[in-house]
Amino acid sequence: MPIVKAKPTSPGRRFVEKVVHPHLYKGRPHAPLVEAQGRSGGRNNNGRITSRHIGGGHKQHYRIIDFKRTKDNIPATVERIEYDPNRTAHIALLKYADGERRYIIAPKKLKVGDTVLSGEASPIRPGNCLPLKNIPVGTTISNIELKIGKGAQMARSAGASVQLLGKEGIYAILRLRSGETRRVHVNCRAVIGEVSNTENNLKSLGKAGASRWRGVRPTVRGTAMNPVDHPHGGGEGRTMGKHPTTPWGQKTKGLKTRSNKRTDSMIIRRRRAKKK
C-alpha cells in the first residue's frame, strides 16, 4: 500500500505519514460481533495508577475475534476486510456456508471473495487454519496457539509471522521474528501466512495529539522529575549519579525479569542469546 505525506500546512501535518488502504470497508462493523469496551485510565480497582502513560483517547467498541478457529470443514467466504482500532492488524469478516459470521485476524494477501477453511484437511493457503502437525516444514505461519484449544496467542500483530523449522515427536520447532526458537505442541493450531498491514511500522503519527487520540499519555523522563517522584530526579544540572532504575528502584537496562520457569523447557534458543 502507498505511503502518503500531507502538505506541510501546519507542524503536525508536516511530519505525518499515513499508509493508505483503499481495500478496507468504510461502513460500520457487524453489530452482533461488537460489544462495549470501557477504559481504565491505567487505574486498578483502588483508583491507583498501575500502568503509566494511559488515559483519554477516542471511544472504541471491541470486535469479537475468533482466535480458536474451531468451525472445522465448513467453508467461509471473506465478505470484507475492516479496520480494527483495538489492534494493528486488519480483520476479516467471514460468512460461513451455514450463514454464521465471524471476525478473524486478516492474513496478508487475503481478499474479499476468497474462501478460507479450518481443519486438518485444509489446503495450505493464506487464512486457512490447521494443526501444526498438518503444516509442511518451512511454512510461514501466524496466530499460533501455545495451549491446545486455548486460541491464538502468538504472532497476532501487524506483519507478524513465525517459521515452522521442524517437528520432533509431539513438538513442533518454531523460529520467531525476535530470533527465539521454541517448542509448541503439534496439536496446537496456526494460520497460514503472515499477518496483514505489514507497512504499519512505516507510518508516522506526526504530532503528539495523534497519540492522545489512541489513549497514550506523555512519558516524562525521570531526570526531569523531583527526587520525591523518581530515583533519577533532583540534583543540580543534568546529573543522575547511579545506575538507571525504574520509578520503583528496580534496575533497568539488562536486568532479567522473566519468572515463568514452567515454560523454560519449551524455549530452545532465547531471543537475547549471544551469537557464537
From Swiss-Prot:
The keyword DNA-binding does not apply. One of its GO terms (biological process) is cytoplasmic translation. Residues 33-55, 221-276 are annotated as: Disordered. GO terms for cellular component: large ribosomal subunit. One of its GO terms (molecular function) is structural constituent of ribosome. Pfam families: Ribosomal_L2, Ribosomal_L2_C. The keyword rRNA-binding applies. It comes from the Bacteria. Part of the 50S ribosomal subunit. Forms a bridge to the 30S subunit in the 70S ribosome. Belongs to the universal ribosomal protein uL2 family. HAMAP family: Ribosomal_uL2_B. PANTHER family: LARGE RIBOSOMAL SUBUNIT PROTEIN UL2M, RIBOSOMAL PROTEIN L2. This is Large ribosomal subunit protein uL2.
